[in-house]
Amino acid sequence: MDAHIIVISGLGYSGSSTLADSLSKRLNWELILAGERFRIYCRENGIDPNDAKQIPKEVHRQFDEKLTLEMGASVRTIFEGRIAIWLSTNLPYALRVWCRTDAITRITRCVQREGLSREKCAELIDNRDRTDSETFEMLYNIKLAQLPSGVLVVDTGVPVESYAEQIIELLA
């Protein structure tokens, strides 16, 4: 595949950031984490990024438009973000990847990363999934449960090396 960029999405704690980081290091490609950039963008505009329901629609749209333009102008770059695979649907040279894993794995990762109880992590993940689903459906009519066509789905419940290698082989 003649991919100029790799675009990775997935629900919280699905392993999308881990995959993006692994690929970036192995391929020596630039890495852009959309969520991290969005939080910076919000702060620069005087908005608390942790209060998702208070972020104006226009802030989301402006950021996503900038990200989409950047994707279109990039080469040898990995973009990771919740809806990045939808934002890149018109880019024929993008390898688009969806990270999928089961709820137990997501909760376990949250416990390890955040130091919270399993119950708190389950609640946090459920709330985040619901908020994200509502936000992106309202903004773009994106249903996170319905992937766009042409997306490679990887099971991220196994060690990252196995599915990172699968993606690298597709680039050859």
Predicted regions and their residues:
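Glycine-rich phosphate-binding P-loop
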Residues: 8-23
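C-terminal alpha-helix
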Residues: 166-172
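ATP-dependent small-molecule kinase phosphotransfer cores
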Residues: 30-90, 103-104, 115-120, 130
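Conserved phosphate-donor/acceptor-positioning beta-strand/loop module used by diverse small-molecule
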Residues: 92-114, 124-126
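Pre-Walker A (Motif I) flank of P-loop NTPase domains
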Residues: 2-6, 75
